[in-house]
Design a protein with these regions (language model features):
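Active-site phosphate/ATP/adenylate-binding loop shared across adenylate-forming ligases
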Residues: 1-29, 34-51, 55-237
Length: 240
């Protein structure tokens, strides 16, 4: 594979520089984020019920809206799962991350809007690579593939409207990833989103052996299982 790291460096440098500017004014960047969220919240049923108009200061917002745990939001999330619009975020949400349900005995469903995926999860991954290249400028990390290990969609909830998917956070991240990232990513989306781990594991190992893997991303315990399987399934590992 052609080493695309030099082509990616200008973008990575820009991302790193932006994050450093934000670190120089942490309070200001947090206030700006709050303002953006309040402007969106003013367009929702949750915000209107609390008199949010998008212009509140932090002190006014904190006084009006006390801190709350997930259970306080469960009724609103269930409305969103049924397809209701403008509940906790403007528009409809069709992706949800499902917790294991170990706390309180009930699964939690976390709405994943396009804005949250882009502004939080994907932005965080981009900054991780940008920071790595800043500290390791001679790296050829984009000269091969990023092995991204993801989960799957469970969709265990009955009566979901068409198009709604519920499952592991990583499944939504892979499903909605920028197509350009697929240049550097293994395995294929079809393999990455497989539900049956017994069928998925050998496919993951095979994909890793056929690629020049330069970085890995995923839940450590899951990845440990994959890495342990490599020498079991193959007598030697030869990367192209």
């Amino acid at each position: 594979m052609i080493n695309l790291t030099p082509l990616c460096k200008p973008l990575m440098h820009a991302i790193y520089a932006r994050e450093q500017r934000l670190r120089g004014d942490v309070e200001g960047s947090q206030r700006a984020t709050l303002r953006r969220l309040l402007r969106q919240g003013a367009r929702t049923a949750w915000g209107r019920a609390r008199g949010i108009d998008g212009s509140e200061s932090y002190a006014a917002f904190a006084a009006r809206v006390p801190a709350a745990g997930y259970e306080a939001f469960r009724p609103e999330v269930e409305r969103m799962l049924r397809g209701e619009r403008d509940v906790l975020w403007p528009g409809r949400c069709d992706r949800y991350a499902q917790s294991s349900g170990t706390s309180g005995g009930k699964s939690k469903y976390i709405p994943l809007t396009p804005q949250s995926l882009q502004g939080c999860h994907y932005a965080g991954a981009a900054y991780a690579f940008a920071s790595y290249l800043h500290h390791h400028p001679d790296s050829r990390v984009f000269g091969g593939c990023n092995f991204i290990l993801g989960g799957s969609y469970a969709n265990e909830i009955a009566g979901l409207r068409p198009g709604v998917k519920v499952g592991d956070l990583s499944a939504s991240l892979i499903d909605r990833i920028n197509p350009l990232v697929n240049i550097f990513r293994i395995p294929s989306k079809q393999v990455a989103l497989m539900e049956d781990w017994r069928q998925k594991l050998p496919r993951l190992v095979e994909a890793s052996l056929r690629a020049d893997v330069r970085s890995i991303s995923g839940v450590p315990s899951w990845f440990l299982t994959v890495l342990r399987e490599v020498p079991v399934s193959y007598t030697h590992l030869t990367l192209p």
